[in-house]
Amino acid sequence: LSSAFAAMAPAAWAEEGVQAWLLRMQQAQQAVPYQGVFVYERESNYATYRVWQGERDGHVVQRIQDQEGDPHELLQQDGRLICNSRGQHVSLLPRLPAEEHVARLVESYELRMVGRSRVAGRVSTVLALIPRDKYRYGHEWHVDAQTGVLLKAVMINDDGQLLERLQFSHFSTEAPAEPALIPQGPCETMAAAEPVVTPVLAPMPQWLPPGFIEVRRQQVPNVRAELAVSSVLFSDGLSSFSVYSEPMGQQLAADARSQLGPTVAVAHRVQSEQGDVMVTVVGEVPLVAAERVALSMRVHDHATASEVTHD
């Protein structure tokens, strides 16, 4: 590290651990007003976005606007995506570990304070989250020293290959005016999925990567049929994947897998006496993890996530 960086860094850096920084990032995500421009990279494709975060009607609102191509906007309120001009349940900024999950990250990742950097002209501290196995990706986060806002995020695979990068090129702590927090064009409202009770006959994984637990079970609309598709979300506190289950009936479908950047999808037909079910594992985990989860799926009476193994 250069002496210049060392001089600009707060003395408290030497005393604060990685977990303290993660908690500060989580708090900043919901408390710090800011605006800026960031670049998003995936699969050697680049896109530029403007972002505004501030308070409106007692809520923390974050608006993201695509600066290239067809107009595209996303709006989040209190951390929940409430509208997307493309009608997709996706968000661009990295999901940070919830406060209650920070302590257990050490089970799945080695947490390191790497050093200091400058991003968008601001002094940042660099955190590394190194996976302890092959079932999750590695992360490098550059956190603004003054605010705790994440200014740069890099995701890499087991071979050190870049999968995804987000980096601010301009960042200001000036609170945005209220009009900047309102979408300027059509922005389709995102309906919340309905929570459901576990069906009597539910495909459940018999294996999960170490550290992953079930965190949410819900129903999502099925555009091809009247029956809803059940969805179960699993997370290790940082990485996550969902398992979608759809009764097949007389439909014909083959197993398949795909990957785009860090996001993988593995579809596998699960046979049972009560009828076949197509399960699809989707998430930002290595393909080896998604495939093993999909192949472990079984239909059992009153299946629960507590019955799985993590070896």
Language-model features, listed with the residues they occupy:
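Gly/Pro-enriched, hydrophobic low-complexity segments
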Residues: 120-186, 259-260
